[in-house]
From Swiss-Prot:
GO MF annotation list: RNA binding
Entries under Gene3D superfamilies matching the protein: NusB-like (1.10.940.10)
The UniProt record lists the keyword Transferase: no
Function noted in UniProt: Involved in transcription antitermination. Required for transcription of ribosomal RNA (rRNA) genes. Binds specifically to the boxA antiterminator sequence of the ribosomal RNA (rrn) operons.
Listed name of the protein: Transcription antitermination protein NusB
Gene Ontology BP annotations: DNA-templated transcription termination; transcription antitermination
Taxonomic source organism: Acetivibrio thermocellus (strain ATCC 27405 / DSM 1237 / JCM 9322 / NBRC 103400 / NCIMB 10682 / NRRL B-4536 / VPI 7372)
Gene name in the database record: nusB
Keyword terms: RNA-binding, Transcription, Transcription antitermination, Transcription regulation
Length: 145
């Protein structure tokens, strides 16, 4: 299937689980059954979706910190799902370069959200990367590996 398609499924699941908060495991399993996923795709989707919700407080704090003047309740649910996915990838997945996480998030925004969303998401994620790189000891620049 590929990482891009898996990322799209993960974003849709994060969005769906934000809207319908009950029976998460059942919703995840039902959604995954709809697709012909190999083991790598399935593992990636499960890791990202479960990781977003496990780390949601931290991720949402990051979004609020860098979306000056925007409360989470003002951010569209689709944009929020995209941001949560990308920030999880950037902060908790060492196998995904920052530029890939940002570019994929912007593409998802272009396909699933409003006109301004790509710029909004790019701006927030750019600030996240800048802070991560400034606070790193030089070993965390995954884009140069």
């Amino acid at each position: 299937m590929g990482r891009r398609a898996s990322r799209e499924i993960a974003m849709k699941l994060i969005y769906q689980l934000e809207i319908q908060k009950d029976s998460r495991e059942e919703q995840i399993n039902n959604t995954l059954e709809q697709y012909d996923l190999n083991e790598n795709d399935r593992e990636y989707i499960l890791d990202v979706v479960k990781g977003v919700f496990k780390n949601q407080e931290e991720i949402d704090g990051t979004i609020e910190k860098f979306s000056k003047g925007w409360k989470l309740s003002r951010i569209s649910k689709v944009d929020l799902a995209i941001l949560r996915l990308a920030i999880y990838e950037m902060c908790h997945r060492d196998d995904i370069p920052f530029t890939v996480a940002i570019n994929e998030a912007v593409e998802l925004a272009k396909n699933y959200s409003g006109e301004e969303s790509g710029s909004f998401i790019n701006g927030i994620l750019g600030k996240v990367v800048k802070v991560k790189l400034m606070s790193a000891d030089g070993n965390e620049n995954r884009d140069e590996e």
